[in-house]
Amino acid sequence: MHVLIKGAGVAGLTAAHELVARGAAVMVAERTHGFATAASWYAGGMLAPWCERESAEEAVLIRGAAAAGWWEAALPAGSVHRNGTLVVAPLRDAAELRRFASRTSGYRWIGAEEIVALEPALAGRFREALFFPEEAHLDPRRALSALRQGLEAQGVVFSGGGIEESRFDLTIDCTGAARIGEFKGLRGVRGEMLYLQTDEVSLSRPVRLLHPRIPLYIVPRGGGLFMCGATMIESDDDGPITARSLMELLNAAYTLHPALAEARLVETGTGVRPAFADNLPRVTRQNNAITVNGLYRHGFLLSPALAEEVAALALGAELKRGNAR
């Protein structure tokens, strides 16, 4: 089978990976060079189905539970870090920690001593926390690049356009936010993030700081680089980060650790997450066209399950019930 995939973000690349593994001949079409226009480029890369369950449907937990294993198999060794997730809150916001715990599972309560054992940099900062030991994280930019390189090594062609779709048996649309206004019910959720660089703080895992209005996550990228995010604004505006969002993210980072106030601000970015009303993704087929969209803030977490669903739909295989919609 000859398949054309439109879109080289995380949804398109994972779908290509699954189809190639099943023997399909795949071409990927992407209008822009590189990944910088894809929401995937600005993602946190947290494979955190239990943390996401706090605000998401159970389907996100079920479909995302196997994501870390999928990425480990697809990427070079050491790309996925299985160090868990730490969720903390300032003393004044302790109620937020209990509210978070009441809405999910897969965690254990830990005290100040164990917090320090996990993250020495947070010594004396928090009295209690939630630790999610089964969660993981990866660097989205390295993951996207490695996935593309692996596909190219297997003969997948990446094209910038000018493709005659009639040449293909099947077309798969993974263009995400580009379909807002064309795909019924699809909306944009703006997400702003930043990168900080410092040698004064060291973290081994994603840390989520709870706040009634400005929750923060900070994800270590290695070498003193930290990704901090992310706002969630009901808008499809992909313009530069606003002064307000920048201030709020930096204030939250300072609350997590004062040394971050002296960190270098090396990058800011904005991505538009495509989402439906229920914030769950959809895979649909009409004749020889499949559409994958609505991954919202769960791109790296849910794309493996969606890719398997796409491959099964494309090739007529029976999908394991755990990944079915």
Predicted regions and their residues:
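N-terminal Rossmann-like FAD-binding beta1-loop-alpha1 element of flavoenzymes
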Residues: H2-M27
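Short hydrophobic core segments
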Residues: K6, R167-A177, A307
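Active-site substrate-recognition segment that forms the wall
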Residues: H17-E18, L47, S79-H81, A177-N287
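Glycine-rich FAD pyrophosphate-binding loop
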Residues: V20-S40
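Dinucleotide-binding Rossmann-like beta1-alpha1 core, especially the glycine-rich loop
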Residues: G44-L118
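Helix-loop-beta segment of a Rossmann-like dinucleotide-binding subdomain
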Residues: R53, A77-V87, G106-R148, T231-S235, ...
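C-terminal catalytic lobe of FAD-dependent flavoproteins
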Residues: A263-R325
